[in-house]
Each structure stands twice: as structure tokens, then as C-alpha cells.
Regions:
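Active-site diphosphate/adenylate-binding microenvironment
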Residues: 2-66
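Conserved thiamine diphosphate
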Residues: 3, 131-184
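Short coil/turn connectors at secondary-structure junctions
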Residues: 11, 38-42, 80-86, 108-114, ...
Length: 334
């Protein structure tokens, strides 16, 4: 059965004009249509925040739940109904502050969820407080002299929790966003997609280096499994391994050719180089990595729970509560 973008649309979004949530919502609708996701077999779960209004604009099942608990509720949905496709949507505040513990455990357990993290480095709904991803020194209503905290780096948190899938896109890059959403859907297990977006009211310009197509040509690298790590406006630069780190080289200089450039391996179990890629671009002179950075197969929590239940049931004399009630004499009271 074929679906159209219109099949997933619902309601009128109430985000500020220019908010990155608009761009992401359009990409999610498009990705679902291209995948052929059945709306009646899909649930979108969110917490609290601007981005967490997203389930209201999806013609699927969904819940706009409580602050920070989207991953926990999405886990319950998936374990109770393994055939359901579950998308969990959180902002950086909702997902990594009050929801940080649920984020790491959903990754550790490897629950088959598509986990979307909309990262604008600010609390928008509560009017401009710094978030767990705001950079050190960031001036906000809750840090008028600049925050003295180091931020979470979502990829680092995901990898540290033994996450098996991590991808990144920019909200304004619709093709790039659609591709990682499709990859997340096809991955079996917890799939974290970080979406870089601006908050036009309280943190406009936070991702300006990669927000425009021209900016991405200069300041980003699109990574693809089994492809060389090449970037630049004219694809003139590449990445090579140097010791335990990476270095930027110019193709054609000092005898360097494309054959010398490091090839991306998203399926490598060891995440050392994947993490190096994911952490680039924070004022270090390296480009921001976009695309699927890590995609490794592993047993999923929901499959293991279902298999365990079936295994135990097969060993028991009674397989459900109704059978247990009918084990002895039964009387019907009228």
C-alpha cells in the first residue's frame, strides 16, 4: 500500500515562524511516506517542550506525556506491543536533563525505538534558560553571567551507554534528515537521531555554521558507510588517521590521493573512530559530521523479553490466567 505525505499530516503546528521544528516535522512526514509506515500501526511519543507538541501534528497514534519521561513511556509501548513502530521525540532539555537517565537506559537496553533528539541548545518553552547542551559561557536568563558548566555531547552520551545507532542531520537539510530517519527505522534497536536546529526566539544562530547549504559545504562532512571521508566545497579535503586521532589533509598535496583517505565504517563494533567523527566541529577546525555515524546490530530488549515470556510459558502447565482459574471445580453464580 502506498502512502502520501498528506496521510501523516494532522492539525496546524503552533510553533514560532522559522522554528526548526517545522522543518523536522515536514521531513518526518516525508520519511514515513517513503518508508510506507502504516499510520494505524505507529505511535509518536513525546515529553514536554516546544518540540514535544509534535504528536499533535501526526495522523498516527501518539502521546504528549510528562517532562523527561518520553523514553520510559515509549519503552512500555514497544514492550507491550512489539509490532508497533514507536518514534520518541524530545528536545535537548526534555531528553537530556530530567530525561537523561531514561535516555541512557533506553540505549543500554537497546529497545527498538526511533529516538529523535531535537537539539537547539536552549529551553524554549520556558523562555530561554540554558540546557544540558548549551556551551560553556552561554548567557541566558538562568545564566546571566554565562554558564560555568560543560555541555553534554549527545553522541558521547549515546556511545557511553553502549548505544548501537547514532546519526545526525540539520533541520534545514530535508534530504539529509529524511535519509537518517529512514536508516533509523531500518535499524533494529535504539536509534538516536540528533537534529541540529535553531530556536529563532531564544537561541537564533546557534547552528549557523551548518544551517545553510553553503555553510554545510564549508563546515560539514557527510559520512556514508564504506565511503571515503571527503569534504569541502570542491571535495578537496579528506580525513586521515593520525595516532589515536584524525587529521585533515588536502587531496593532491604531498602525494595524497583519495585512496589514502580514511573510509567510514558505520558497522564497526568498536566505536573509537565513530566517536572521533561524532565529536568533530566544536571549534576544533574540523567539519561537523552529518549522516549515519554508527549502525551496529545487537539483540534488542523487546525481542528478548518476548522470547523469554514464550520460553517460560512453554515450560509451565498453565499458560495464562484464564487457564489457571479453570484448573479446579468451577461454579457459576447467577
Amino acid at each position: 500500500m502506498e502512502f502520501k505525505v498528506q496521510d501523516y499530516k494532522k492539525g496546524q503546528p503552533r510553533w514560532c515562524p522559522g522554528c526548526g521544528d517545522h522543518f523536522f516535522l515536514a521531513s518526518l512526514h516525508k520519511a514515513m511516506a517513503e518508508i510506507g509506515v502504516e499510520p494505524w500501526n505507529t505511535a509518536v511519543i513525546s515529553g514536554i517542550g516546544c518540540s514535544s507538541r509534535l504528536p499533535h501534528y501526526m495522523a498516527t497514534y501518539g502521546m504528549n506525556t510528562i517532562h523527561g519521561r518520553a523514553a520510559a513511556i515509549a519503552t512500555g509501548c514497544k514492550v507491550a506491543n512489539p509490532d508497533l513502530t514507536v518514534w520518541q521525540v524530545s528536545g535537548d532539555g526534555d531528553g537530556l536533563a530530567i530525561g537523561g537517565n531514561h535516555f541512557i537506559h533506553a540505549n543500554r537496553r537497546n529497545i527498538n525505538l526511533n529516538m529523535i533528539l531535537l537539539n537547539n541548545r536552549i529551553y524554549g518553552l520556558t523562555k530561554g534558560q540554558y540546557s544540558p547542551t548549551s556551551p560553556r559561557g552561554f548567557v541566558s536568563k538562568s545564566s546571566p553571567y554565562g554558564t560555568v558548566e560543560d555541555p553534554f555531547r549527545p553522541a558521547e552520551l549515546c556511545f557511553g551507554a553502549r548505544g548501537h545507532f547514532f546519526a545526525r542531520a540539520v533541520a534545514t537539510d530535508a534530504p539529509g534528515t529524511v535519509e537518517i530517519l529512514k536508516a533509523a527505522y531500518n535499524h533494529k534497536g535504539a536509534a538516536v537521531c540528533e537534529i541540529l536546529q535553531n530556536c529563532v526566539i531564544f537561541n537564533n544562530g546557534t547552528h549557523d555554521a551548518v544551517y545553510s547549504k553553503e555553510g554545510r559545504a564549508k563546515n560539514a562532512i557527510y559520512v556514508e558507510h564504506d565511503k571515503p571521508l571527503i569534504f569541502g566545497e570542491n571535495r578537496e579535503y579528506g580525513l586521515m588517521q593520525e595516532g589515536f586521532g584524525l587529521k585533515i589533509v588536502k587531496i593532491g598535496e604531498n602525494g595524497i590521493t583519495e585512496k589514502d583517505i580514511l573510509v567510514h565504517d558505520a558497522h564497526c563494533e568498536d566505536n573509537t573512530l565513530q566517536l572521533k567523527l561524532a565529536l568533530m566541529g566544536n571549534g576544533d577546525g574540523f567539519p561537523v559530521a552529518l549522516g549515519v555515524i554508527r549502525d551496529v546490530d545487537a539483540p534488542t530488549y523487546d525481542d528478548c523479553v518476548t522470547a523469554q515470556i514464550e520460553e517460560v510459558k512453554a515450560q509451565k502447565k498453565y499458560h495464562n490466567f484464564a487457564e489457571l482459574l479453570e484448573t479446579n471445580d468451577i461454579w457459576e453464580v447467577k
